[in-house]
């Protein structure tokens, strides 16, 4: 057999040594560099080093947690994400880390279907709450995400999970329990070419929130035509979390707007951030426009409890149980309510039943986006009476025979149990 030239063998040895040195250097740097608690680029808390215990070692949970920790704390994580996304895009891959690179530059987060148990628990917590407060009008607006409304902009052959069977099942179960489901899918679909979702973020734009508000106002008995708005651009450099999560469109910047009433006679509201013991006379914290998380301009981000009071002739009080999608919509509702109490169950740890009495709540509105609504567990815990114990949830049936299609499915639900 003919021997390889010495130069070739030398090149192979050198390459192997350099690669080994590189791996060793990265391991050492990962060990020496302090952990980061928060990723400004991804706008999320990063996983900290997990504690070791015998039970976690036996169950394998420690290994899973440690893998997540290493992934979050890896040296130059943001750079590696962008590099991988660039390489994947060159190879023709249009999906990275659960985010699709769609047409017209849209990044769309895939929908993770909830387990049947998760769906049952969330919906039954809401129907049980409705039964305990059957004297109050209750509404639910579960906003569809871009992957639903802008499905025509998904890349070819994208296997996106259909949200519609789950929204239909939720609507049927809630309506049966007396909770009015505010379905904004048709409204948003009619305006899908009007910039209702950000290109680089998972939120709807203020324009999208406004269209949803117009539909919600009809259900709430609000004359939305009584106030006209002007759209005011407040930033031209917004870059959302989907860009950071996927690495796609890393240099993309887009416009962020607010809607301001044209009529100066519209009463001003006072916003009370209860946990922070801070009051302001604006829905917007413009200092956030100088940060990575520009969407936090709306109500300074997410808080456990925020109380909005408005000197209006209306004597209505509204409890909004919400996620961040509500933040850009609530300013449209404020002029029509004497008091709006916003509760984000992810950060709220008090007794919701007591809050209902103290704040003299007259109406209840759930305002979520579908991705958060079907994955978060905090809503169930917040709605549960503090003295209650776990029970077997009733079944909320979904017709998901084709979860990648755009067709809706019929749904039904059993009677809720306490």
Predicted regions and their residues:
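Extracellular glycan-modifying ectodomains
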Residues: 1-418
């Amino acid at each position: 057999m003919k021997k390889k030239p010495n130069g070739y063998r030398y090149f192979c040895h050198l390459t192997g040594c350099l690669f080994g040195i590189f791996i060793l250097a990265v391991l050492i740097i990962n060990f020496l560099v302090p952990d980061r608690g928060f990723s400004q680029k991804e706008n999320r808390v990063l996983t900290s080093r997990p504690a070791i215990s015998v039970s976690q070692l036996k169950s394998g949970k420690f290994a899973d947690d440690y893998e997540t920790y290493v992934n979050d704390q890896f040296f130059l994580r943001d750079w590696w994400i962008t590099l991988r996304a660039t390489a994947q895009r060159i190879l023709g891959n249009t999906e990275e880390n659960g985010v699709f690179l769609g047409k017209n530059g849209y990044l769309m987060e895939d929908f993770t279907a909830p387990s049947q148990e998760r769906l049952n628990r969330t919906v039954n917590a809401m129907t049980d709450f409705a039964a305990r407060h059957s004297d109050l009008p209750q509404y639910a607006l579960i906003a569809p995400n871009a992957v639903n409304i802008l499905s025509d902009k998904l890349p070819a052959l994208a296997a996106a999970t259909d949200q519609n069977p789950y929204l239909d099942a939720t609507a049927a179960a809630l309506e049966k329990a007396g909770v009015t489901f505010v379905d904004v899918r048709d409204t948003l679909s009619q305006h899908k070419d009007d910039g209702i979702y950000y290109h680089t973020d998972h939120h709807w734009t203020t324009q999208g929130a406004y269209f949803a508000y117009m539909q919600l106002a009809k259900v709430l008995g609000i004359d939305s035509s009584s106030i006209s708005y002007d759209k005011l651009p407040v930033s031209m450099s917004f870059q959302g979390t989907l860009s950071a999560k996927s690495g796609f469109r890393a240099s993309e910047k887009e416009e962020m707007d607010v809607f301001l009433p044209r009529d100066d006679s519209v009463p001003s509201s006072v916003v009370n951030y209860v946990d922070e013991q801070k009051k302001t006379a604006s829905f917007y914290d413009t200092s956030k426009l100088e940060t990575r998380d520009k969407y936090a301009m709306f109500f300074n981000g997410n808080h456990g409890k925020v109380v909005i009071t408005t000197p209006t002739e209306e004597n209505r009080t509204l409890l909004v149980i919400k996620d961040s999608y509500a933040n850009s919509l609530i300013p449209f509702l404020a002029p029509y309510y004497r008091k709006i109490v916003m509760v984000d169950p992810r950060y709220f740890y008090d007794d919701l039943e007591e809050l209902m009495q103290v704040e003299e709540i007259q109406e209840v509105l759930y305002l979520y986006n579908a991705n958060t609504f079907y994955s978060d567990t905090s809503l169930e815990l917040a709605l549960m009476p503090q003295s209650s114990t776990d029970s077997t949830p009733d079944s909320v049936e979904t017709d998901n025979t084709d979860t990648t299609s755009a067709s809706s499915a019929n749904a039904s639900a059993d009677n809720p149990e306490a």
